[in-house]
């Protein structure tokens, strides 16, 4: 053991030891309790950033802690390798995305290994490998057979110059990020997965996720968006056709003054054929972004269709407008407009001089100026004929029943959740295993022809879809009739890859089936770690896919993740680290200067996992100083501990002196609190406990046999508490101080109940209720001894001078009050 702390050397030695001994490679073992710890897999950008380091350090602390607790721990790592960023980077660098991606993976794998994470690298997966996406294609075929994968027209952001679909984040001020062209809304045929078939179960099972953050549960509940409402039929003024409207406020039905339909509604398209003004309006609407948030905040615009519907109760004529704020994807693409009781309808009505008809007044009877603002709360019905004077809640049921009994409507449970559109008009993604034949139509690729390989030598230009221009890919033969046919050139949304990867880690070498029985052993994941930004999309899709895999008999649980931790961001100067802000701190430079253990210790000590972490250079220096202090202390006690650790009776040592028992009690109290905090995932206070223990031990001397044994016990506790957080130095010191074996094979320390037993009490001494001193007495001291000790306390005696004691009151285990 060197006298000075040399992190680079000891970290290299520890990592070589783990690799040579395959320390973290695990096998299924039914005799042991399993623990599956997983951090969200990274996109291989080429460089680890501090957000990665924090995420993976937290996960590693949890995994190593569970190893110490004797569990069979799986902690794998892989790469979310497909997607738009790789394609864009490849366009800029003029090289194939496959080449760029694999180069980045190699670099990032090395960076992760430098941090000493306890990953089972034998299970590594890369989502752009055909051995992985082959099973994703197989899964798509199963969904297609069950009617859960289907194709329909949907609206997308279309760049007319680059001839490609854009994600919302690729649009800057209404223009394509590369071409600068004005982006259009275009309707194209796309593949969808029927997640809505699982809406009710996805909502209901949120109640089972007891160890998920409440914020995530709420976000998913709102995204699924269950509502109870009524479908209402509005017949056309002329002809047998009707428009169906879904509403959660049937109590406002008598206040409807117009209907509004989406620009993509078939009726709007039909009217555009007969009116140039309507056609021009629909064209203008195509230049609106697709995102719901953008539509909600844009200026409300519309045009009269020239058609009328009939109110189902009053039989009044209602004009039908085409409005840019109505979403075709929501319900039926038709809105019943109640301007007096809906802010959006109110804004639109004032703009186009449409009538307002108040039908709800505040329940407390105070006046409301409906011309100034819509009254949107429940209340009492007015101007509603036979429904007058009943409250909104009662009116919901009364009007719903009336509509049902008169064939004008029906109750319906509605979900805001829409089917998952997985088509991407991109190159770098999983090919969708579908063939189009002029004779046979849409034909799924036979399972024995999987995988449909993505050509990896393409250099995308950013114009159009590269697969549509690659004849060697799209030209094929129909598997049914053997005539010339074409492949689907859309690729899958990368969220599909990340919706089932956690299960594939259980059997990445399996080439006969998607998942085998090992998946049932390891799933569900016991602890999942990742950012709150994935609360809805990724986590919802993974929950959906887990239920699909269960229904296919591949898994035997209902949910993928038992416990979820959403870690906070890493900030510098109050802002999230980013290259554009110039506030990035690179992990590699810190590891080179201080070592991985220092980086890990700072990350863990600086803030609780779920809170944002403010970067501090002085905090990193402080972590480094602590590890040097630990090393220096260990070097000083090395010879004494090596000698004690060779003694057979070392574990049965008895401490007699009160001061030694008190010191031991302090150490075990720190351990007791640290164990509570480890279970609560409050790792920063575990570090605080370790620092307290070291400060206690440093004051002891190895020249005293009792204290030397205290140092041995305390150091053994300290190193195990640090082992999940700073594994390299803990591994090295454990062996250098003669504790024997691998520290990871030793059980997690537990406080000794005897050590926690208090032998002395501190009591406060009052004179006429005022604090005058404190005394230490044995726990079982008699009243006489307590009184005598209190009266002989120096400060108490000074205040008693020339005073006559009337009585002494002893409150057991709390205080003594001397009345004078």
From Swiss-Prot:
Full protein name: Leucine--tRNA ligase
EC number(s) on file: 6.1.1.4
Taxonomy of the source species: Bacteria, Pseudomonadati, Pseudomonadota, Gammaproteobacteria, Legionellales
Gene for this chain: leuS
One matching Pfam family: tRNA-synt_1
Location of the protein in the cell: Cytoplasm
NCBIfam families tied to this protein: leuS_bact
PROSITE patterns xrefs: AA_TRNA_LIGASE_I
UniProt short sequence motif 'HIGH' region, positions renumbered to this chain: 42-52
Xref: PANTHER family: LEUCINE--TRNA LIGASE, MITOCHONDRIAL, LEUCYL-TRNA SYNTHETASE
Keyword annotations of the record: Aminoacyl-tRNA synthetase, ATP-binding, Cytoplasm, Ligase, Nucleotide-binding, Protein biosynthesis
Keyword flag Disulfide bond: no
Residue sites binding ATP per the record: 579
Family as reported in the entry's similarity comment: Belongs to the class-I aminoacyl-tRNA synthetase family.
Keyword match Signal: no
Entry-linked Gene3D superfamilies: 3.10.20.590, HUPs, Isoleucyl-tRNA Synthetase, Domain 1, Valyl/Leucyl/Isoleucyl-tRNA synthetase, editing domain
GO CC annotation terms, alphabetical: cytosol
Catalytic activity: tRNA(Leu) + L-leucine + ATP = L-leucyl-tRNA(Leu) + AMP + diphosphate
Short motif ('KMSKS' region): ranges: 576-580
Molecular function in Gene Ontology: aminoacyl-tRNA deacylase activity; ATP binding; leucine-tRNA ligase activity
Residue spans crossing the bilayer: none
GO biological process, one term: leucyl-tRNA aminoacylation
Main location: cytoplasm
């Amino acid at each position: 053991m060197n006298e000075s702390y040399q992190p680079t050397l000891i970290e290299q030695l520890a990592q070589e030891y783990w690799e040579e001994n395959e320390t973290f490679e695990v096998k299924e073992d039914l005799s042991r309790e399993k623990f599956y710890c997983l951090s969200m897999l990274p996109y291989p950008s080429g460089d680890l950033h501090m957000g990665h380091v924090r995420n993976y350090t937290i996960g590693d602390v949890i995994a190593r802690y569970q190893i110490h607790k004797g569990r069979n721990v799986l902690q794998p790592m892989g790469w979310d390798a497909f997607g738009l960023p790789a394609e864009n980077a490849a366009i800029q660098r003029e090289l194939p995305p496959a080449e760029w991606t694999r180069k980045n993976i190699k670099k990032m794998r090395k960076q992760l290994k430098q941090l000493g994470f306890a990953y089972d690298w034998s299970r590594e997966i890369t989502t752009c490998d055909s051995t992985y996406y082959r099973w994703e294609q197989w899964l798509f075929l199963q969904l297609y057979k069950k009617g859960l994968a289907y194709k329909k027209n949907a609206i997308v952001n279309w760049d007319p110059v680059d001839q490609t679909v854009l994600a919302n984040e690729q649009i800057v001020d209404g223009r394509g990020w590369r071409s600068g062209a004005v982006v259009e809304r275009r309707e194209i045929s796309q593949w969808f997965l029927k997640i809505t078939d699982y809406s009710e179960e996805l909502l209901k099972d949120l109640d089972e996720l007891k160890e998920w953050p409440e914020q995530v549960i709420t976000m998913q509940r709102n995204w699924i968006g269950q509502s109870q409402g009524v479908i209402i039929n509005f017949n056309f003024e002329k002809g047998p056709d009707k428009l169906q409207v879904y509403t959660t406020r049937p109590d406002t039905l008598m206040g409807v003054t117009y209907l509004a339909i989406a620009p993509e509604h078939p009726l709007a398209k039909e009217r555009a054929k007969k009116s140039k003004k309507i056609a021009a309006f629909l064209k203008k609407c195509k230049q609106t972004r697709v995102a719901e948030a953008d539509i909600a905040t844009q200026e409300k615009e519309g045009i009269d269709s020239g058609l009328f519907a009939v109110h189902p109760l009053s039989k009044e004529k209602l004009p039908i407008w085409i409005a840019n704020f109505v979403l075709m994807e929501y319900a039926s693409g038709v809105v019943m407009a109640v301007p007096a009781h809906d802010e959006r309808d109110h804004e639109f009505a004032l703009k186009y001089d449409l009538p307002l008809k108040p039908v709800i007044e505040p329940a407390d009877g105070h006046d409301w100026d409906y011309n100034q603002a819509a009254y949107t709360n429940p209340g009492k019905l007015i101007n509603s004929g036979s429904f007058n004077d009943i409250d909104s809640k009662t009116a919901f049921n009364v009007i719903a029943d009336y509509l049902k009994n008169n064939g004008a409507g029906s109750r319906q449970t509605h979900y805001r959740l829409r089917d998952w559109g997985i088509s991407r008009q991109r190159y770098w993604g999983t090919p969708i295993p579908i063939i189009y034949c002029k004779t046979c139509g849409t034909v799924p690729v036979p399972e024995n022809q999987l995988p449909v390989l993505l050509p990896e030598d393409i250099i995308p230009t950013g114009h159009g879809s590269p697969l549509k221009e690659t004849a060697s890919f799209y030209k094929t033969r129909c598997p049914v009739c053997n005539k010339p046919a074409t492949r689907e050139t859309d690729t899958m949304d990368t969220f599909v890859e990340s919706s089932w990867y956690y299960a594939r880690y259980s059997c990445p070498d399996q080439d006969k089936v998607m998942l085998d029985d090992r998946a049932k052993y390891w799933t569900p994941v016991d602890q999942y770690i990742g950012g709150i930004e994935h609360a809805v999309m990724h986590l919802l899709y993974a929950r959906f896919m887990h239920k699909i895999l269960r229904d296919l008999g591949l898994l035997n649980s209902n949910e993928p993740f038992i416990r979820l931790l959403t870690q906070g961001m890493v900030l510098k100067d109050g802002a999230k680290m980013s290259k554009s802000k110039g506030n990035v701190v690179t992990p590699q430079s810190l590891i080179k200067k201080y070592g991985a253990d220092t980086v890990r210790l700072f990350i863990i000590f600086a803030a609780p996992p779920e809170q944002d972490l403010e970067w501090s250079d002085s905090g990193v220096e402080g972590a480094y100083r602590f590890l040097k202090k630990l090393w220096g202390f260990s070097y000083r006690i090395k010879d004494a501990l090596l000698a004690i650790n060779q003694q057979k009776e070392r574990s049965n040592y008895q401490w007699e002196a009160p001061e030694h028992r008190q010191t031991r009690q302090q150490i075990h109290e720190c351990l007791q609190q640290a164990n509570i905090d480890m279970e609560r995932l409050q790792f920063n206070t575990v570090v605080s406990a370790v620092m307290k223990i070291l400060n206690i031990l440093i004051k002891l001397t190895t020249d005293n046999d009792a204290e030397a044994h205290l140092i041995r016990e305390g150091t053994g506790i300290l190193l195990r508490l640090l082992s999940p957080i700073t594994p390299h130095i803990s591994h090295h010191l454990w062996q250098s101080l003669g504790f024997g074996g691998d520290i990871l094979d030793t059980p997690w320390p537990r406080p000794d109940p005897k050590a926690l037993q208090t032998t002395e009490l501190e009591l406060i001494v009052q004179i006429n209720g005022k604090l005058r001193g404190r005394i230490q007495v044995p726990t079982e001291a008699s009243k006489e001894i307590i009184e005598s000790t209190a009266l002989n306390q120096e400060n108490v005696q000074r205040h008693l001078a020339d005073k006559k004691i009337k009585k002494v009151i002893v409150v057991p285990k709390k205080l003594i009050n001397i009345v004078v």
